[in-house]
UniProtKB/Swiss-Prot annotation:
Entry protein name: E3 ubiquitin-protein ligase ORTHRUS 3
EC number(s) per entry: 2.3.2.27
Pathway: Protein modification; protein ubiquitination
Gene name of this polypeptide: ORTH3
Function according to Swiss-Prot or TrEMBL: E3 ubiquitin-protein ligase. May participate in CpG methylation-dependent transcriptional regulation.
Alphabetized UniProt keyword annotations: Chromatin regulator, Coiled coil, DNA-binding, Metal-binding, Nucleus, Repeat, Transferase, Ubl conjugation pathway, Zinc, Zinc-finger
């Protein structure tokens, strides 16, 4: 016959076994879980009255019902000696960690038995590489058992006797709860932790504090889950080394021709905000630099050699940095081109929305903003501006023919102003290049010349002339134009200057120097506010700040909670010492006497550290394997070098013939 099962009383006081409400003298309360039990329905009730003071219920004492055990445990005999022996064997296994021992014992007692090692290895193989950062499961509310919302670390009271004076100190019990659930629990009149039943101090009841470290960790974990769930955005990017030599179109192009074409390979190694001529050292392909008179069939080809980078805009520049280049395309009727100098109109004032990209009507005034301000800044500082003339300028005798764009050297902006009427920003460009212009037969470049007479300056407004010496000027001693002041430092990086192998090594070095994995970011959120490292034995103060237990204790080492005082041989009343939190003015003197480790936070940190160590060990093994292959290649290098030396003359001849 199967013996009856032991059940406690329900919240209304009715015994769940006999279905009757026992009187108070026949009910017994557990000292751990504070659960009422019916004495008559207990299989082994306490024998004496003194035993009831420290009585533990069957659930807390571990007393089990003599029921038949299912599954694997069923074969261990009626008394359970075999089951106890199996548990002892698990405890004696030194190869298992405490967590693994607990898992095996739980499987054994639940009737599932011990999972075969082969099955565990198979599960590890299938889940390898797909293990998420399971942080949310460690941070669950003690009441609603859901993920924490506005987490509060619960503090409890315990007695502390010092100098024959009793204090009640509050310290975290290591359990967390949602702020809403905690306030609801307190509103029902409870003054104990929902997990360990320890008493909660009145200061926490009236003023609970949110643990910001747990908030940050939960937020990062949720971001990582969303990033894994959603598909990554497809970015169509082609590295400069992989681009063709000419502009190209892809299957994503909506229109034919160069309307939706992509730029070809950039042949010069200059940043996009480079000022002045392009020298030979920035031309690794031809080793001659950008020469005056070079021409191209379109703006995309002009871009590839760095003369003018924008595809559509006629001005390349930044309002806070200056203008690098302009294109003369005859877009305004007032533009005048005299070769060595010209009048240039700024941008703006036209409605170009929708299909009005070719609108030539000025709708409003131009102002010195954006590109116009960039030109004015180059005028103020005397920067050289690269000038490209287009065949679209039908009124200029200096424009190239045959639908080409031609690089005509560098110019300097001497003046800028606005004309009356519909105000337009105007700029006076004067040539200042060391190479002769394409339309002259001179063998030398420009020389300093007087400024031309511009009649419209008599009616100009907002006239601006350079007062200081220009950065790009003529050096009489060297008889050439050069930078008289240091050129402005570039604000944009040069892309793809290194070889592919060098770029790969550089990316790996940057990645190893700046780890930005989600686990590393989570560990960073769990740093101690004193040592600024990942916490060991984390403790949470009453003001919701987190520290290492050792750091906090060493911070107040040697400071007693009570300070004895005396005056003139008389003993005064003892005074309590004030120990302020390292992060705020809150007094944590009682807390420091016996800080309790926040177990939930400690488990998360330990798990993240373990996963990080596994990843580092895996990457180290891969690095050693790749290092071995590199060493083998280094051993073979002398043979390759001898072979290259024998073919040096042949390769040089081939290169020379190709250049011709």
């Amino acid at each position: 016959m199967t013996p009856a099962t032991q059940y406690p009383c329900d919240p209304e006081g009715v015994c769940m076994r006999c279905k009757s409400m026992p009187p108070p003298e026949e009910s017994l309360t557990c000292g751990t879980c504070v659960t009422p039990w019916h004495v008559s329905c207990l299989l082994s009730p306490p024998e004496t009255l003194s035993a009831t003071l420290q009585w533990l219920c069957p659930d807390c004492s571990g007393e089990t019902n003599p029921l038949p055990v299912s599954g694997v445990a069923a074969g261990y005999g009626s008394v359970g000696s075999d089951l106890v022996a199996a548990i002892h064997s698990i405890e004696a296994d030194e190869t298992l960690s405490a967590e693994e021992k607990a898992k095996k014992k739980q499987q054994l007692l639940s009737g599932k038995g011990v999972v075969d090692e082969d099955d565990e290895e198979e599960k590890k193989k299938t889940s390898k590489g797909k293990k998420p950062i399971d942080v949310l499961s460690h941070f669950e509310c003690s009441f609603c058992m859901q993920s924490l919302q506005k987490p509060v670390s619960v503090r409890v009271l315990f007695a502390l006797a010092l100098m024959l004076v009793w204090f009640l100190e509050s310290t975290p019990c290591g359990h967390n709860a949602c702020l809403k659930c905690f306030l609801k629990w307190m509103g029902q009149g409870h003054r104990s932790c929902g997990t360990c039943r320890s008493v909660i101090p009145e200061s926490m009841v009236t003023n609970p504090r949110i643990n910001l470290s747990i908030v940050s960790a939960i937020r990062l974990a949720r971001v990582s889950e969303k990033a894994d769930a959603r598909t990554s955005k497809v970015v169509h990017y082609v590295d400069n080394e992989d681009r063709p030599d000419k502009a190209f179109t892809t299957e994503r192009a909506k229109k034919t021709g160069n309307a939706n074409a992509s730029s070809g390979k950039i042949f010069v190694t200059i940043p996009r905000d480079h000022f002045g001529p392009i020298p030979a050292e920035n031309d690794p392909v031809r080793n001659q630099g950008l020469l005056v008179g070079e021409s191209w069939k379109g703006r995309l080809a002009c871009r590839q050699w760095g003369a003018h980078f924008p595809h559509v805009s006629g001005i390349a520049g930044q309002a806070s940095y200056g203008a690098q280049s302009v294109v003369l395309a005859g877009g305004y009727d007032d533009d005048e081109d005299h070769g060595e100098w010209f009048l240039y109109t700024g941008s703006g004032g036209r409605i170009l929305k929708g299909n009005k990209r070719t609108n030539t009507v000025q709708a409003f005034d131009q102002v010195f903003l954006n590109f116009n301000e960039a030109l004015r800044l180059s005028c103020k500082l005397g920067y050289p501006v690269r000038v490209v003339r287009s065949t679209k300028d039908k009124r200029s005798p200096y424009a190239p023919q045959g639908g080409l764009l031609r690089y005509d050297g560098v110019y300097r902006i001497e003046k800028c102003w606005r004309i009356v009427g519909i105000q337009m920003c105007r700029f006076l460009f004067v040539r200042c290049d060391n190479e002769p212009a394409p339309w002259t037969s001179d063998e030398h470049g420009d020389r300093p010349r007087p400024l031309p007479n511009v009649p419209e300056l008599n009616m100009a407004t907002d006239l601006f002339e350079r007062k200081e010496s220009p950065s790009w000027d003529f050096d009489e001693g060297e008889d050439r134009w050069r930078w008289m002041k240091p050129p402005p430092a570039s604000k944009k990086a040069v892309k793809n200057v290194l070889d592919p192998e060098e770029r790969k090594l550089l990316r790996e070095a940057i990645k190893s120097a700046n780890p930005n994995t989600m686990r590393a970011r989570l560990l960073k959120e769990f740093k101690c506010q004193i040592c600024q490292k990942v916490m060991t034995n984390p403790v949470t103060t009453p003001c919701a700040h987190n520290f290492c237990k050792a750091c906090l204790e060493s911070k107040f080492a040697g400071t007693a909670l009570v300070r004895e005082r005396g005056s003139g041989g008389r003993k005064l009343r003892s005074q309590k010492s004030v120990m302020k939190c390292p992060c705020c003015p809150t007094d944590i003197a009682e807390f420091v006497q016996n800080p309790q480790v926040n177990r939930e936070v400690a488990e998360v940190i330990e798990k993240l550290k373990k996963q990080e160590e596994e990843e580092n060990a895996k990457s180290l093994d891969e690095g050693q394997c790749s290092g071995t292959s590199h060493e083998e290649e280094d051993d073979e290098q002398p043979k390759k070098r001898i072979k290259l030396d024998t073919d040096a003359e042949v390769s040089a001849t081939v290169v020379e013939s190709d250049m011709k």
